[in-house]
A protein has these predicted regions:
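Short, polar/flexible loop-turn hinges at active-site or ligand-entry regions and domain interfaces
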Residues: 49-52, 144-147, 171
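A generic structural motif
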Residues: 6, 144-145, 203
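N-terminal Rossmann-like or analogous alpha/beta NTP/dinucleotide-binding catalytic cores
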Residues: 1-134, 252, 291-293, 297, ...
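Conserved nucleotide- and phosphate/pyrophosphate-binding catalytic cores
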Residues: 152, 158-358
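Internal, conserved structured core segments that host functional sites
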Residues: 106-110, 114-164, 168, 189-190
Length: 358
C-alpha cells in the first residue's frame, strides 16, 4: 500500500523515490493485493483554503500513475476521501499517540518548517502521521514502498499497530518499509541543488514535461560552482548532474552516447581531474532522461484522450478499497468493544438483567 498527495503533477523525485518501484512490485506477482491511494484528504490538511488545487490535481496524479505503468487490473487505484472508513480509523488511533510523540516525528518537523507552520499548525496536518497509519492498516498492508523521507511515518504506524494490538488484541498487521534499492534514489534533489524537489521552488522535472522542457531544466541544473572552466577539476559530490546520472544511467548508455567512457565511474574520474565540461555531462543526462520519459509521455497522451475512463477506473477502485477498509474497521470496532448493535449477547444479557429487576 502506498500513495501520493494530489497537489501537483508527479516529478522525477516521486518516480525514483517509489513510483518506479511500485510498477516493478506490481509486475512481480509477489503480492496478492496492491492499493495505490491518491491522498486528497491528506492534501487538504495544508490546502484547506484551496480545495480546487487538490480537486484539479486528482486527474494529473491518476494520469501520471497510468502513464508510468500502474495497471488497474493489478493495482487498485483509489481516492482517499471516497473511503470514509479511513477517517474513522484515524480517530480511534488518536487515542494511542501522544502529542509529544507527534512533535518528535522528524518528517512532521521538517514539513512544518517548510510550510512556515511554526506558530499556527493546522490540527489535521499535525496529526497526518496518524492518518497515514489508518491508510496503511485499513488494507492490512505488509509492505509500504516509500522514499527515505517517509520512513519515520512507517515507524509511527508500527508503533500504533503494536499499541493497538497490545491493548485490544491481535487485529492489525505490522507493515514493513520498502526503500529504493539504488542509494541515489533515496532522495533526488531539485535541479537547483536544494534537498528536495518542490513545485513552489520551481526545481522539478515533471514526468509529463516535454523533451524541450527537460532539456532546458537540465541545462540550467546546479553543478559545481567552482568548476568555471573545462580544465578546472570538478566536484562530483553534491553535483546534481551526477546525482541524476547515478539514479538513471545504465552501462549501455555510455556505449550509445559517450563511447569514449566505459562507465559512469570513468566519467566521474575525468570530471574530478579536470578537462571535462558540464555541458557534455548535461547532454548525456538529457539523452538518458529522454529514454526514460519518452514512453511515459506517449502513454500519457493516450490516457488523456479518455478522461471519463480514468475517472471510472478511480470510482471502481474506490469501491474496492472501501469494501476492504470496512472489513478492517469492523474488526477494530469488535476488538474495541464498540460493536453494540452487532453484539447480540450484550443486548440479550442486559435485557435479561433489567427483566430480572422487575
Amino acid at each position: 500500500m502506498t500513495g501520493d498527495r494530489p497537489t501537483g503533477k508527479l516529478h522525477l523525485g516521486h518516480y525514483v523515490g517509489s513510483l518506479k518501484r511500485r510498477v516493478e512490485l506490481q509486475n512481480s506477482g509477489e503480492y496478492d493485493e496492491i492499493y495505490i491511494m491518491i491522498a486528497d484528504a491528506q492534501a487538504l490538511t495544508d490546502n484547506a483554503d484551496n480545495p480546487d488545487k487538490v480537486r484539479n490535481n486528482i486527474i494529473e496524479v491518476a494520469l501520471d500513475y497510468l502513464s508510468c505503468g500502474l495497471d488497474p487490473a493489478k493495482s487498485n487505484i483509489f481516492i482517499q476521501s471516497q473511503v470514509p472508513e479511513l477517517t474513522e480509523l484515524a480517530f480511534y488511533y488518536m487515542n494511542l499517540v501522544t502529542v509529544s510523540r507527534l512533535q518528535r516525528n522528524p518528517t512532521v518537523k521538517s514539513e512544518i518548517q517548510m510550510r512556515n507552520f511554526e506558530a499556527s499548525i493546522p490540527v489535521g496536518f499535525f496529526t497526518y502521521p496518524i492518518s497515514q497509519a489508518s491508510d496503511i492498516t485499513a488494507f492490512k498492508a505488509t509492505t509500504v514502498p516509500v522514499g527515505e523521507d517517509q520512513k519515520p511515518m512507517i515507524e509511527q504506524t508500527v508503533e500504533i499497530v503494536r499499541r493497538f494490538n497490545s491493548v485490544y488484541g491481535e487485529v492489525l498487521v505490522e507493515p514493513e518499509v520498502l526503500l529504493p534499492q539504488n542509494a541515489a534514489c533515496l532522495r533526488l534533489p531539485g535541479t537547483d541543488g536544494k534537498a528536495k524537489m518542490s513545485k513552489s521552488l520551481g526545481n522539478c522535472i515533471y514526468l509529463s514535461d516535454s523533451a524541450e522542457d527537460v532539456r532546458k531544466k537540465v541545462m540550467g541544473m546546479f553543478t559545481d560552482p567552482n568548476h568555471l572552466k573545462v580544465s578546472d577539476p570538478g566536484k562530483v559530490e553534491g553535483n546534481c548532474v551526477f546525482t541524476y546520472l547515478n539514479a538513471f544511467s545504465k552501462p549501455e548508455h555510455f556505449a550509445k552516447y559517450l563511447p569514449e567512457y566505459a562507465s559512469l565511474d570513468e566519467l566521474k574520474e575525468h570530471y574530478r581531474c579536470g578537462g571535462l565540461g558540464d555541458v557534455k555531462c548535461k547532454k548525456l543526462l538529457i539523452a538518458v532522461l529522454e529514454e526514460e520519459l519518452a514512453p511515459i509521455r506517449a502513454r500519457r497522451r493516450e490516457f488523456e484522450q479518455n478522461i471519463e475512463g480514468v475517472y471510472e477506473m478511480l470510482r471502481k477502485g474506490s469501491q474496492v478499497a472501501q469494501a476492504k477498509a470496512a472489513r478492517t474497521l469492523m474488526e477494530v470496532k469488535d476488538a474495541m468493544r464498540i460493536n453494540y448493535f452487532q453484539d447480540k449477547e450484550l443486548i440479550a444479557r442486559q435485557a435479561e438483567a433489567y427483566r430480572e429487576c422487575k
